[in-house]
Amino acid sequence: MEMKNILNRMLNHEELTREETKNIILGITQSEFPEEQITALLTGLQMRGVTVDELLGFRDGILETGVPAILNCDRYIDVVGTGGDRKNTFNISTTSCFVIAGAGYKVAKHGNFAATSVSGASNVIKNHGVQFTDDLDKLNRSIDEAGIVYLHAQLFAKAMKFVGPIRKALQFPTVFNLLGPLVNPSQPKCQLLGVANLDQMRLYNKVKHKICIDYTDYYTHLTLPTTSPVYI
């Protein structure tokens, strides 16, 4: 795949197909594109906005090149947010995971280091002394005994690791903020998802119906004296 052709098409306001965005991820994981081209791609997508099929294709590529996390329990939930709302809130989804697990419902939390915020889920978990692992025995022991397991994105998704430094340098949200909640390697059937704005909520509603996940969206600007929109 020629990234030059992709970028030229984007300059002409053309949409990419699901297969094309999947192949972009495959190319990223095989180091086919220089950082400058990946930076241009992420910037262009952020300025134009990503389509449902483009997002699904990126998701397909990440899952195809990633490592699955097979958990030996029937039902569990992921509580996750896109980040990038620029409001410098605390880690709402990460905190919620411990509340839910404490209430007795199993949680498979997927997260990463901060790219566009002060602190990501992995920053919080690591600073509390948890060692990241992709060892399935340890992961299953964690969810069995503690009711919660943490899945660090860069251990399971090659593309996330490749684009990490680029995202950090850009300092604004990219399509990978949207992808994080869609590529949990354990593929939970239930998810509570926090989004940065209402446009993202509508986008996820279309995406989730195509991949058949039982989920609830909430707008992450949560405050005590006011209500927050929820999409079920």
Residue ranges: model-predicted function:
Residues 81-86, 111-117, 156:
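Acidic, glycine-rich active-site loops and adjacent beta-strand->loop/helix elements
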Residues 219-226:
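Conserved small/polar residues in nucleotide/adenosyl-binding loops
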Residues 78, 107-111, 132-135, 150-152, ...:
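General beta-strand structural signal in soluble alpha/beta enzymes
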Residues 138-194:
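Phosphate/diphosphate-binding glycine-rich loops and adjacent basic-rich segments that engage nucleotide
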Residues 230-232:
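Hydrophobic alpha-helical segments, chiefly the membrane-spanning helices
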Residues 42, 90-146:
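A glycine-rich phosphate/pyrophosphate-binding beta-strand-loop-alpha-helix module
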Residues 1-88, 103:
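Acidic, glycine/proline-rich low-complexity segments that act as flexible tails and inter-domain linkers
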Residues 193-213:
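Gly/Ser/Thr-rich active-site loops/lids in small-molecule metabolic enzymes
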